[in-house]
Amino acid sequence: MPIITLPDGSQRQFDNPVSTMDVALSIGPGLAKATIAGRVNGQRVDACDLIEEDASLEIITTKDEVDGLEIVRHSCAHLLGHALKQLYPNAKMAIGPTIDNGFYYDIDLEESLTQEDLEKIEARMKALAKTKYQVIKKKVSWQEARDAFEARGETYKMEILDENVSRDDRPGLYHHEEYIDMCRGPHVPNMSFCQHFTLLNVAGAYWRGNSDNKMLQRIYGTAFHDKKALKDHLTRLEEAAKRDHRKIGKQLDLFHMQQEAPGMVFWHHNGWSVFRDLEVFIREKLTEYGYQEVKGPLMMDRVLWERSGHWDKYADAMFTTSSENREYAIKPMNCPGHVQIFNQGLKSYRDLPLRMAEFGSCHRNEPSGALHGIMRVRGFTQDDAHIFCTESQIQDEVTNCIKMVYDTYQTFGFDNIAVKLSTRPEQRVGSDEIWDQSEEALKQALESMDIAYEIQEGEGAFYGPKIEFTLFDCLGRAWQCGTVQLDFNLPNRLGATYVGENNERLVPVMIHRAILGSLERFIGILIEEYAGFFPTWLAPEQAVIMNITDKQADYVQEIAQKLQKCGIRAKADLRNEKIGFKIREHTLKRVPFMLVCGDQEMEAGEIAVRTRKGNDLGKFKVDDFVSYIQDQIASRKLNLEE
C-alpha cells in the first residue's frame, strides 16, 4: 500500500504497487495524456515502472524543458533506429544517446548516406510517429537480451552487453513494434510525444571513439515539444552556419588549417593582428591586477611530468620526443613549469601572494574526430595564470580573479554568464579543514560580489574546489571559458614551499586561473559572436580610404599615411573601380570605417565617413576623424551597430 507524496506535499495512498501513469490518471486524464515519465525519490523512471513502497513522485510532462525534452529526444533516437532498420535491414545499430540540443545514432552500414537519404529516413520516422504506437518496456535477463540481439545480428549491442553489462543485471529492452533497442531509459510511453523532430546531418565516428576501430556513420537529429520551438531552433542553426568561424575565417583571410598539420593553426596577417591585440589587452589586465608575466619551456623531461602526476593522467594526450636517451614531453599545460619558477630562490610569506601569468604554447594530442576549426585544436595558447598564496589569502585572491574575469568578459560584450562551484569529491587530497576553508572562501568571494551560482556537489577535482564561468553568446550557446581552481596537491608534489611567520616551511596553496582559456578558441567564439564584425580595436583593417577618380589619389595616400602614423590600421584603395564596387567589397570584408574622397572633400580637407553597416556619419576633418577612431580604439568600444 504505497503512499505517494507529490511536489505540493499532498499524498495519495494506493492498495497495490502503482506506476507514474497510474498516479497521473488518478489526478486526471489531461495530466495522464501529458505524462512522459516520472521522478521517484529523485530518480527518473519510465511511466510504466511500478512503485512498490512509499515514495515522493514528480510527474515529468511536456512542460518539462529539461528532463522531459531529453527523454523525448532519446526516444527520437530509438525512432530513428526503427526507421533505419525498416529501410536498411542490414544496418547494424551501435549507440543512440542524447546530446546538447539533440541526439544521434551511430550505425554500421556499407553504403554512405547522403542528405537525400536523410530526407527519406526522416519521412519514414514521421510516418511511424504518426501512428502514435505504444513503446513497450520489458526487463529481461542478460542472456535473453543477448539472444534477442544475436538473433538480429546486432553485433554492437552484443559487445555492449558483453563488456558493459553485468550478467546479474536485467537490461531494459524497449519494443518499438518490431524494432527492439536496449537502454536504461526512461522513454516516452508512446510516439505521440515524438512529433516535432528533424534530421540534421551525417558524419563519421569511430566505434567507441577509438581510431583503431571501424568508422561508423553518425546521424544527428534534434527534437522539441512543439513545432514553434523546433522552427526557432532551426533558425538559430541557420544563423550559426552563417557565423561559422571557419567560413568567416576564410572570407576575412584570418587563418587556415591543413592536413599536414592537423589541429594546428596557420595564422594569416589579418588573424594574427586579432591575436596580438588580444594579447595586448590581456597584458594590460595582468598589469592592472598585479601579475608577473613569465615564459616556461615548451618541452620538459618525462621525469618532471611523472613527479607532477600528469604522466599518469595525460600521457596519451601528450606529444613526446627523445634525445640522448632522455624522453621529453611537449607541455599540455603550464602549471608544472610555473612551480619550477616559484621554486627558484627562497620565498617568504611576505612574498605572497605571487601571481604568475603566461601566454603558454600548449599541445594536446586530441582525437582527429574531435578537431573543429580553431575551436578544438592540438596546438593552442593559454592565457594561463597561477597564484601562490597562503590559506588566509584564498578569498581575497579568488575575489581578485573573479573581478578580472568579469572585467574582461564585459569588454567583449558578454554579460550573460553562468557560474558553477564544484565541491569536494569522495576521493581527494587535503584535510577536511582546508576543504571547508577553501569552499567557504569561494562561496564568500562569489556572494560578496552578488554573483548567483550553482553548486555542483562532488564535482570538484581531487586536488581542490573550482569555479567555472560559462558565457552565453547571441545565439544562446554556452561556452565554458574561465576557471578558478584551487590546488592543494601540485605544490606539494613538486616541492614548493615558503617560510612562514614562525620560520616554518609551509606549502603554498596554488590557484589555477584562466579567463579566455585558449586564445585560439576564444577568437573562434568572437568571430561567431560578432559574425566577423569585430569591434574597431580588434578589426584587422580599421579604415580604408577610397578615391572616386585619379585626381584624389595623392590626397588619399596622404590620409592613409597620416592614419598609419597615428597607429590606425588603414590602407588606401586606389583601384580604378567604381566607388560603389569598392564600398561593397570592403563592406564584405567588415572594415569598420570607409572613407570616401571626391573633389569636394579634397578641396575642403575633409573625408566622407560611412560604416560597414551602411551608416553615413557625414564629413570629418581628417584630424577630427583621427581623434574619433582613436577614441574608439583606446576605449575598446564595441561599436557593433556602426
Curated annotation (Swiss-Prot):
Q: Which GO terms describe its molecular function?
A: ATP binding; metal ion binding; threonine-tRNA ligase activity; tRNA binding
Q: Name one GO cellular component term.
A: cytosol
What SMART domains does UniProt report for this protein, alphabetically? tRNA_SAD
Give the EC number(s) listed in the UniProt record. Answer: 6.1.1.3
> What reaction gets catalysed by this protein?
tRNA(Thr) + L-threonine + ATP = L-threonyl-tRNA(Thr) + AMP + diphosphate + H(+)
Q: Where in the cell is it found?
A: Cytoplasm
Where does the record place the region Catalytic?
A: 244-535
Question: Which NCBIfam families does its entry note?
Answer: thrS (TIGR00418)
What's this protein's function?
A: Catalyzes the attachment of threonine to tRNA(Thr) in a two-step reaction: L-threonine is first activated by ATP to form Thr-AMP and then transferred to the acceptor end of tRNA(Thr). Also edits incorrectly charged L-seryl-tRNA(Thr).
User: HAMAP family annotated for this entry?
Assistant: Thr_tRNA_synth
Q: Subunit arrangement?
A: Homodimer.
> What name has this protein been given in UniProt?
Threonine--tRNA ligase
Specify the species: Vibrio vulnificus (strain CMCP6)
